[in-house]
């Protein structure tokens, strides 16, 4: 932490640690005309665009193999066309095409001395797919189980590694066998590869123990502060010939695991001067050290503020970022502060400089949403009409043969289905059956596809409904709202839950919203002209409430075993409450045929909206 009263350009990089830095390195001392100078950092290195677009194997040399010359992003650097020692101090990228047959793969040696062949799997345009969905779909088509190593996105592609030729051949057979929701075929490209870096750079168990010992020496228990500044140069590590480079995934993972297992209460962490050029491997620190308040990332190679998004779950109060290339990209101090504070709104100090207090809005006060109201029908006549229609409709819909719904639809009827636009894992939740027909306009932008997903005419509509999973709806969960009504048209929606009754998804709970537009039918009923169905996974609360109150068996008359007095009481209670005979009898039986107590129970439950609409269907 900077000493009190120290000027902005004289602060040091201490986070309760004694090392000091040279003066004049503040992030707001720009030269005139100096902006983002990424294109001028050495001419002999391979451009990032080539690295990102090449399908060949990529090998990174050790970032500290060359002489150690401090990189200063705050001074103007001329373009260089020839290799310099400065450039050799940075990470080198070598792109090579492996011309060996795919079956041979790239050889790597595991810690137990066995040799493994590695293959890099590439999915062009894979970035548009959710990771879990993509891997689940590949696994469902692959003839052997596989363990994807180091899954990541690169430009528009998705990549991961597998470690033997048998798995690679099985994945090759999946090429173009997976169809996405837009009916596109997914390509899978297999290339032999060097072992992924997470495997190459794994520390051996004895090395992890030595790292743990060294980290304990660097930990200040009184301040709950861990100093990992320039860890690779630690004398004890160098003496034991242990190479710990925190910009390698395996090394960072080992360090974070030690923190999680030994000092999860950590408040301050110094990672300065470790040549970190990305923070992907550090993202788990949000869970492993949730109390972290002070983080020093100064003197690294972070080029973009977007890297901070990977750790923005931390509730940081102090952050050091000076001497990173990203500091060159800000035009002024206020932009720099506001950009960083977007990620860490509770930040009080940046690069040792006190910040103005954050503007806070009192939004954390608990607010309760008003309780959901019951159905709305407008009039009793409309209520009777709609409830009778829904009772008939879903009796046929859940019967197993939906062909009987033909009479419910107009000749020119139109129907569509949609699902959530970005589900976490559609395969795991078994929503994949609905995806190919989903017409979610937030996801489907192509007008031709949108039109194709509309089902026109009653024959096509019912044929489409017959292809959907077989269901059993919980009519007690229905909430019905009439939103528009004229003499020739009625628009209403119904919300509720259902479960699937066959296949792999048997007993899976779904929630739905269905909007009908109907016109009068010749039989004094309703005829559907437009049907929109939205299906999602039921929430935990909906699952808990689903099918909790089984519907009584329909009956048109009181149970014969009732006495005459009970039958008279039942008829009177049904007339006064408006409930049908089945639900009236249930209420009376639950209250031991005490008419007064039954009436009180009915009034109480109706006021709370706990009596389902089916109870009033006669």
UniProtKB/Swiss-Prot annotation:
Transport keyword on record: yes
Residue span of region Interaction with ALYREF/THOC4 and LUZP4: 2-197
A GO cellular-component term linked to this record: cytoplasm
Organism: Rattus norvegicus
Subunit structure: Heterodimer (via NTF2 domain) with NXT1. The formation of NXF1-NXT1 heterodimers is required for the NXF1-mediated nuclear mRNA export. Forms a complex with RANBP2/NUP358, NXT1 and RANGAP1. Associates with the exon junction complex (EJC). Associates with the transcription/export (TREX) complex. Found in a mRNA complex with UPF3A and UPF3B. Found in a post-splicing complex with RBM8A, UPF1, UPF2, UPF3A, UPF3B and RNPS1.
PANTHER family, sorted: NUCLEAR RNA EXPORT FACTOR, NUCLEAR RNA EXPORT FACTOR 1
Stated role: Involved in the nuclear export of mRNA species bearing retroviral constitutive transport elements (CTE) and in the export of mRNA from the nucleus to the cytoplasm (TAP/NFX1 pathway). The NXF1-NXT1 heterodimer is involved in the export of HSP70 mRNA in conjunction with ALYREF/THOC4 and THOC5 components of the TREX complex. ALYREF/THOC4-bound mRNA is thought to be transferred to the NXF1-NXT1 heterodimer for export.
Subcellular location: Nucleus, Nucleoplasm; Nucleus speckle; Nucleus, Nuclear pore complex; Nucleus envelope
Modified residues (Asymmetric dimethylarginine): 41
Family statement: Belongs to the NXF family.
Protein's recorded name: Nuclear RNA export factor 1
UniProt repeat feature LRR, residue ranges: 265-290, 291-314, 315-342, 343-370
Designated gene of the protein: Nxf1
């Amino acid at each position: 932490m900077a000493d009190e009263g120290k000027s902005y350009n004289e602060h040091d990089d201490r986070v309760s640690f004694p090392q000091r830095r040279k003066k004049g390195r503040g992030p707001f001392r720009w030269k005139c005309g100096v902006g983002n100078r990424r294109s001028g950092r050495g001419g002999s290195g391979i451009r990032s665009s080539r690295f990102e677009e090449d399908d060949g194997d990529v090998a990174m040399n050790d970032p500290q193999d060359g002489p150690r010359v401090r990189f200063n992003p705050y001074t103007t650097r001329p373009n260089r066309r020839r290799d310099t020692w400065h450039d050799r101090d940075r990470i080198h990228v070598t792109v090579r095409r492996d011309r060996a047959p795919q079956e041979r793969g790239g050889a790597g040696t595991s810690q137990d001395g066995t040799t493994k062949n590695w293959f890099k799997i590439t999915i062009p345009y894979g970035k548009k797919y959710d990771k879990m969905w993509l891997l689940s779909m590949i696994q469902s088509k692959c003839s052997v189980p596989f363990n994807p190593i180091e899954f990541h996105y690169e430009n528009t592609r998705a990549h991961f590694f597998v470690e033997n030729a048998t798995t690679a051949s099985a994945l090759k057979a999946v090429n173009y066998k997976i169809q996405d929701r837009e009916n596109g075929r997914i390509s899978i490209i297999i290339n032999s590869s060097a072992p992924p870096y997470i495997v190459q750079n794994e520390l051996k168990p004895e090395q992890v123990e030595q790292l743990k010992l060294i980290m304990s020496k660097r930990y200040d228990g009184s301040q709950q502060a861990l100093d990992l500044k320039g860890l690779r140069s630690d004398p004890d590590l160098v003496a034991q010939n242990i190479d710990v480079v925190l910009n390698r995934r395996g090394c960072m993972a080992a360090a974070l695991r030690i923190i999680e297992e030994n000092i999860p209460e950590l408040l301050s962490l110094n990672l300065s001067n470790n040549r970190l050029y990305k923070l992907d491997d550090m993202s788990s620190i949000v869970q492993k050290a949730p109390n972290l308040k002070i983080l020093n990332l100064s003197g690294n190679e972070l080029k973009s503020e977007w890297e901070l998004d990977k750790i923005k779950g931390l509730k940081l109060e102090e952050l050091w970022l000076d001497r990173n290339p990203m500091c060159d990209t800000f035009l002024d101090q206020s932009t720099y502060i506001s950009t960083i504070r977007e990620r860490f709104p509770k930040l009080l100090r940046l690069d040792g400089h006190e910040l103005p207090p954050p503007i806070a809005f009192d939004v954390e006060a608990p607010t309760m949403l008003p309780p959901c109201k019951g159905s709305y029908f407008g009039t009793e006549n409309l209520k009777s009409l709609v409830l009778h229609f829904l009772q008939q409709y879903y009796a046929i819909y859940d019967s197993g043969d939906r062909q009987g719904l033909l009479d419910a639809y107009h000749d020119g009827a139109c129907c569509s289905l949609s699902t959530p636009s970005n589900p976490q894992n559609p395969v795991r939740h078994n929503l994949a059956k609905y995806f190919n027909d989903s017409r979610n306009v937030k996801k489907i932008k192509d007008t031709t596809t949108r039109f194709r997903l509309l089902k026109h005419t009653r024959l096509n509509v019912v044929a489409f409904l017959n292809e959907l999973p077989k269901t059993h709806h919980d009519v007690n969960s229905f909430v019905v709202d009439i939103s528009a009504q004229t003499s020739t048209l009625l628009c209403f929606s119904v919300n509720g839950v259902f479960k699937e009754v066959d296949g792999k998804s048997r007993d899976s709970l779904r929630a739905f919203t269905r909007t009908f537009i109907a016109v009068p039918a010749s039989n004094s009923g309703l005829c559907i002209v437009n049907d929109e169905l939205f299906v999602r996974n039921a929430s935990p609360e909906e699952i808990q409430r689903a099918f909790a109150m089984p519907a009584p068996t329909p009956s048109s008359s009181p149970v014969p075993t009732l006495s005459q007095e009970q039958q008279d009481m039942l008829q009177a209670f049904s007339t006064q409450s408006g409930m049908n005979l089945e639900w009236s009898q249930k209420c009376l039986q639950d209250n031991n045929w005490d008419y007064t107590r039954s009436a009180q129970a009915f009034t109480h439950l109706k006021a709370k909206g706990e009596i389902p609409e089916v109870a009033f269907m006669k």
